[in-house]
Amino acid sequence: MDNSIFYSLGNGIKFNKNKYKKEIGIFNGITSHELDKQTKTNNKVHFFKNTTPSTPVISKKDNIKQKKEEEEDNDNDNEESKEDDDFVEDDDNDDDDDDDDEDEENEEPKEKEFIKHQVNNDEEEEDITLFNKSNENENSDDSDDSDDSGKNKNKNKNKKVSKETQEDKHKREIATFRNKHRIKVDGTDIPDPMTEFSQLENRFKVRKYLLNNINEIGYKEPSPIQMQVIPILLKEREVVAIAPTGSGKTASFSIPILQALYEPKKEGFRSVIIAPTRELAQQIYRNFRLLSKGKPFRICVLSKNLHNQSTNENLIKNYDILITTPLRLVYLIKENLLSLNKVEYLVFDEADKLFDKNFQEQVDIVVTACQNPKLKICLFSATMNQQVEELGHSIMKNPIKIIIGEQNAAAITVDQKLIYVGKEEGKLLAVRQLIQKGLEPPILIFTQSKERAHDLFQELIFDGINVDVIHSERTQFQRDTIVKKFRMGKIWVLICTELMARGMDFKGVNFVINFDFPHTLASYIHRIGRTGRAGRPGVAYTLYTDADTPMLPTIVHAMKQSGSHVPDWMLNLKVQGKKKQQYRLKGVERESFSTIPLSERTSSKFKLRKNKKSFNLPGDQQKSNENNNNNNNNNNDNKKRKSFNNNGEKNNNPERKQKQIKKPKKII
């Protein structure tokens, strides 16, 4: 009997076959003596005789032939087994009686009938298997066709299973890669991240000049934000990206924009990048210049000179990329001096600041001015609250949200430390002690106001330190020269306000000192983010007094979240919600820390400008004209009053001083 009855148990299983072969041999009439000889040679045999795991498909004709051959073999085996049995019985029972021989002769035909009947049953059992269909066609050709169709179905199933397993495996690999780099994504149809810049050429067909510029700048491996944002923008999707300071957000949108614009065209602005400060706009401009080297893209930063030249339409059409602050752009839009109908990419850098209450109206004007149906809006920032996200989603189409690390968290590369100074007078002493310890410049010091920045400047300038101060009241020429000197190392310590807290990339800054405690968590994160950029380590010191306790728990939890050491008692501090809200809105009225007399504090070189120049928007022109007319009327009234003496008599020269010149006496 064939051993096909065991084929359904599984592939490649090894077992002791003696137990099963004895039972089969008994039914086939094989003696136990012959079975023992066979089992000595092969105690353990592979489950299948054939090495191939797949069983051949046999048609009905082949089955009939095999059955006939098996019947003949079984008959021969039965005859041989009978002869063996007779020979054994004769040897063993030589002393038996003749009656026993007669009984054996009578029993032989019965055994033959039993064996034949058993073989026929085995042949019937061989026709039935566990995997055969119950209903079979009568024609052998039909059965062969059905077998072929079954094979094809199994192959298709295997292919589907293999495809599904490959897709699942790919998804698992992408998920582990994102978890490794702390990339969190939210959206639909999210492209896979890239692992190397070399994939830009094969996967996205990025132009060679861009790849060469990336190598020349020194970008070896993409940062986590670049790994995910660049593929998304190259697939022409909108994005909301939240990543720590110094993580490479500018390059993540500069590379896809240059690839999408392809080449310079004289069609007007096709990409607009909006930044909250002019210093940040200048920095983005430099980044675009480095990446666009080799292609004559016309990139400009909106300035007063361009304001004056904006009436020339041909000049504006020559530009491809515009980088600006929102106020200047809104002025040109309201004056109908600028068209944004060709804009394909609108990027808001430091979006949480631009979507603040002070900028919301300006942002709405810019968005409504961009009428291109292919417009794609992108938001980038290190911090972003829920309100800003909702405003962003209201003007975007199915954006993808990306978070690197934890949302609204400080950079891991910055070692954050708190220093208690008691009162305001202790801050100046703490700064001098830190500098004496050997803090390596360049150093950034943040204050909450321009006046306090001036006072600190005048205190440190007499300590023999190359120090300077920058804020919004300085002229544009002064601000540009100060930033340039600070980058070149001519200025060691730069005192600044919130103007320099956002987006500025000073690669060599080793230390940041928060002279005044920040009012919000976002301000704290952006301040300390001026150090520890691009993977380099940095240190941030924050000075605090008793008046800063309402905001202290928030900063402490941010430090703990980013891995900095914080005492346990600070984590257990509890502050009333009203005090915290008042601190955020009103701040703290701080006492003066200066040791210089009040009359000698202000310097003529850094004197604050009283008449601040600003751009009058078209809607504000009537108010300004009315104010000017009122001022002119008041001046005329004053002139009329001065033209009369106290006695009511007219003065011939009212503008001169009313000193009467004595005429010389006539000599007779």
From Swiss-Prot:
Segments for region (Disordered): 37-174, 601-668
Family label: Belongs to the DEAD box helicase family. DDX52/ROK1 subfamily.
UniProt function note: ATP-binding RNA helicase which may be involved in the ribosome biogenesis.
Keywords in alphabetical order: ATP-binding, Helicase, Hydrolase, Nucleotide-binding, Nucleus, Ribosome biogenesis, RNA-binding, rRNA processing
Binding annotation for ATP: 243-250
Domain Helicase C-terminal: 413-574
Domains: entry comment: The Q motif is unique to and characteristic of the DEAD box family of RNA helicases and controls ATP binding and hydrolysis.
Location of the Helicase ATP-binding domain: 230-402
Main location: nucleus
Classification via Pfam families: DEAD, Helicase_C
Listed InterPro entries: DDX52/Rok1_DEADc, DEAD/DEAH_box_helicase_dom, DEAD_box_RNA_helicase, Helicase_ATP-bd, Helicase_C-like, P-loop_NTPase, RNA-helicase_DEAD-box_CS
Name of the protein: Probable ATP-dependent RNA helicase ddx52
Organism: Dictyostelium discoideum (Social amoeba)
Phylogenetic placement of the source organism: Eukaryota, Amoebozoa, Evosea, Eumycetozoa, Dictyostelia
Chemical reaction(s) catalysed: ATP + H2O = ADP + phosphate + H(+)
Listed PROSITE patterns: DEAD_ATP_HELICASE, HELICASE_ATP_BIND_1, HELICASE_CTER, Q_MOTIF
